[in-house]
Amino acid sequence: DMSEEMLTVAQQKTMDLMPRPFFSCQRLERLALPRAVDLAVCALDSLDYITEPKSCREAIRQVYRALNPGGIFIFDVNTPEKLRAMDGQVFLDEDDDVYCVWRGEFDRQTNICSYGMDLFQRQGKLWSRSFEEHREYAYSAETLVDYLKQAGFTKIAVYGDCRMAPPEAGEQRIYIKARKGIIK
């Protein structure tokens, strides 16, 4: 992940796991690991945040290089339909200690969805305000499968949102699994 904060949260949540998961803060398109791995998981639309298609293609190549023969790459992305539908929408999420409002904009020329999030968090009797800017590229399943094949992946499967079945029309998120070929 590119976020030290997100990696810290992930490490805290996996402290009791054995073997301990390996976390690394680096750009996926320049992925360098100390040794090859059997499984790579890229979750929470991480590939969507790579807003240059050639960089996404390179990231997938780097994951391929980082895997042992027979290794598996699993990732999820928001569907283009979901990102397009966010255009002009305002979203609100609140509970007793957090208030979040954000507005989405989709640029059909660049295929990028941008959204700014205003986050208000209660701290005692006061509220603190922070702002986050997000940009996600709308990759189609077909494009990603093509990138995987170009990198050398085989046995590529595309699944619907949290189902071990092909995606249906209007799906919000898809999951993709691919295997690095075994050298004979």
Could you tell me what each predicted segment is?
Residues D1-L31:
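Class I SAM-dependent methyltransferase SAM/SAH-binding core
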Residues E4-E5, L47-I50, E58, N68:
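Conserved SAM-binding loop
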Residues R135-K184:
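C-terminal lobe and adjacent flexible extensions of AdoMet/dcAdoMet transferase-like proteins
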Residues I74-V145:
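SAM-dependent methyltransferase
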Residues S55-I72:
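A short glycine-rich, Lys/Arg-flanked "PGG" loop and its adjoining helix->strand segment in the class I
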Residues A36-V37, A85-Q89, G170:
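Short aromatic-enriched loop/helix-cap "lid" or pocket-rim segments at secondary-structure transitions
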Residues D38-S55:
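A short SAM/SAH-binding and catalytic strip from SAM-dependent methyltransferases
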Residues E29-A40:
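A short acidic, Gly/Pro-enriched loop at the edge of an enzyme's catalytic core
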